[in-house]
Design a protein with these regions (language model features):
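A phosphate-binding catalytic loop at a beta-strand-loop-alpha-helix junction
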Residues: 110-123
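Cysteine-based protein phosphatase catalytic domain of the PTP/DSP
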Residues: 18-112
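RNA-binding accessory domains that recognize and position tRNA/RNA substrates
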Residues: 1-16, 41-42
Length: 123
């Protein structure tokens, strides 16, 4: 009997909402090269990317260039610092609540929002 072990890959799971979408994905650089994953992310044409991970986690995935590269493509980037397997603290929750109007406006205006953490499963 042969057992096939699948390698995790960078994949964006999208949910279409009216004319916009919400996507969920891992950190670019987590499963393959940052540049390959970044290209796949921007091919989805998001207007907004929200990273829910810590700076050390971003460093471990070689993703510290993510904000700058998104900015250069005029894609808004927001960072909510949430530890893996934890709930957001009060500050992070306030930041999330302040982002909600931007995210809703983007989605219901026909744009795309991609949320990422390290593994792409959610915090």
């Amino acid at each position: 009997m042969e057992i096939e072990i699948s390698k995790s890959v960078f994949e964006i799971v999208k949910i279409e909402i009216e004319s916009g979408f919400v996507g969920l994905c891992p950190m670019p650089g987590k499963f393959s090269s940052f540049d390959e994953d970044f290209l796949q992310l921007v091919k989805e044409l998001p207007q907004v990317v929200v990273t829910c991970a810590t700076q050390p986690e971003m460093m471990a995935c070689s993703a510290t260039r993510l904000p700058e590269k998104l900015y250069n493509l005029e894609i808004q980037w927001f960072h909510i610092d949430v530890e893996d397997f934890q709930v957001p603290d009060e500050f992070s929750e306030e930041k999330w609540n302040s982002l909600l109007p931007i995210l809703k406006e983007t989605i219901f205006g026909g744009g795309g929002v991609i949320l990422n953490c390290v593994g792409g499963c959610g915090r």
